[in-house]
Swiss-Prot record:
UniProt key word Transcription: no
Entry superkingdom: Eukaryota
Purpose of the protein: Strong antifungal activity against fungal phytopathogens.
Lineage, uppermost ranks: Eukaryota, Viridiplantae, Streptophyta, Embryophyta, Tracheophyta
Main subcellular localisation: secreted
Compartment(s): Secreted
Organism listed in the record: Arachis hypogaea (Peanut)
Annotated protein name in UniProt: Antifungal protein 1
GO biological process: defense response to fungus; killing of cells of another organism
Keyword line: Antimicrobial, Fungicide, Plant defense, Secreted
């Protein structure tokens, strides 16, 4: 898991 993926996942908070 790279930084970009993490940031994107963090930004897209889908419940």
């Amino acid at each position: 898991l790279d930084s970009l993926s993490f940031s994107y996942n963090n930004f897209e908070e889908d419940d």
